[in-house]
Amino acid sequence: MSQGGGLNILSIQSSVAYGHVGNSAAVFPLQRLGIEVWAVNTVHFSNHTGYGEWRGPVLAAGDVSEVLRGIGERGVLGSCGAVLSGYMGDVSLGEVILGAVGRVRGANPQALFCCDPVMGDEGRGFFVRPGIPRFMRERAVPAADVVTPNQFELEYLAGVEVRTLGGALAAAEKVLGLGPGTVLVTSLRRRDAGEEGRIEMLAATREGAWLVGTPLLPLEVNGAGDATAALFLGHLLLGRGLEEALSLTASSVYAVLEKTLRRGAREIQLVAAQESLVAPPVRFPVRRVA
């Protein structure tokens, strides 16, 4: 995976003052990896919406566009190695993000676009506005180099149910057929895993697929997927191979979640577990599955 023109990532996501989701979950892990982050916030909430109550503004697509325009006017887009996107409030914001990706690629053709296609999850279904799922499948994912769906999002993008490893591989192949070069399934639970109490990540390219599993912790938190996408992209930008990036990402995220569980915290403990972002204490092995 090419490093592009520099260790700088343009991250266009939501932001919260309290807790860790969106940019508030992505920026710090990337910085701990030694990567500069140009964070452009799409909302600025008091806390994430999982609490049921929150305050703060949603930025209009035009305001986000102005911030991105200002960054471009600094003449630095040629040193941007990647663009990272997450939750998109509406289709107009999605168009702004794709416009920014186009300008970055115009300045640095080797820049990566990592799209975390946030749409929903198992049990909750879709939680985004109408039009976003279709925009993700027809516009954002085809434009991306890397996509990081959870299992629910993988099923939607591929148009198939995923219950086995073979099903997951077939679904990942369908998503690769939409355009991206790498698919990271951030949370895979399958009937044929052979062991209860585990959760897996699956990384697939046109050359093969790799799987890593970790213990499934009794924990319900927000932001782990945002941190996962950021770490995986960061390791790729640093020039690490897919297998190493997968192992490091899964191992770091597990360490963060384990720390969160031990502390009985509602928010992922990125700061308390920050050494694990760089050097996870336990490295989970990766095996090739295709």
Swiss-Prot record:
Record's catalysed reaction(s): pyridoxal + ATP = pyridoxal 5'-phosphate + ADP + H(+)
Record has Nucleotide-binding as a keyword: yes
The protein's required cofactors: Mg(2+)
Positions bound to ATP: 116, 153
Family annotation (CDD domains): pyridoxal_pyridoxamine_kinase
GO biological process: pyridoxal 5'-phosphate salvage
EC assignment: 2.7.1.35
Enzyme kind, highest EC tier: transferase
Keywords recorded for this protein, A-Z: ATP-binding, Kinase, Magnesium, Nucleotide-binding, Transferase
A Gene Ontology cellular-component term: cytosol
InterPro entries: PM/HMP-P_kinase-1, PyrdxlKinase, Pyridoxal_kinase_PdxY, Ribokinase-like
Associated pathway: Cofactor metabolism; pyridoxal 5'-phosphate salvage; pyridoxal 5'-phosphate from pyridoxal: step 1/1
Subunit structure: Homodimer.
NCBIfam families (alphabetical): PRK05756.1, pyridox_kin
Family of the protein in this entry: Belongs to the pyridoxine kinase family. PdxY subfamily.
Function: Pyridoxal kinase involved in the salvage pathway of pyridoxal 5'-phosphate (PLP). Catalyzes the phosphorylation of pyridoxal to PLP.
Protein name from the UniProt record: Pyridoxal kinase PdxY
Annotated source species: Rubrobacter xylanophilus (strain DSM 9941 / JCM 11954 / NBRC 16129 / PRD-1)
The encoding gene: pdxY
